[in-house]
């Protein structure tokens, strides 16, 4: 009986240690992506914390996330944005770095059109030609998607001492 209990304890310890290593590896990858975001955003009007908040909302930092035609960390629509990806030489939208680069490029393009971060997020989420979204925004309505991301981005800025 003692031998069985000892084996069970050993298995549980090994499982917990393995789980801890997986969690540590996930944090390491997320740290790498966060550094990459910071680097790209140095030459951009886009706040890195905004990008991080978009990633949290879109994929929960899961680089393998797929929702229809939208893939990766920033859930880039691979049909709509294939030309942009090609122009940026980002050939694999499932690659986290390519996905981040294309996602930030989309945000930059939207920021050129709409200076308000809420509008940028609304159209990132719904698409450039969302007529209902345009009308709603013109009437002062901000989507819950945009509100949640803006709140999280502000929280991340506070955490980063900005």
Name these PLM-found stretches:
Residues 2-36, 42-44, 62, 79-162:
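Non-catalytic cell-wall polysaccharide-engagement segments
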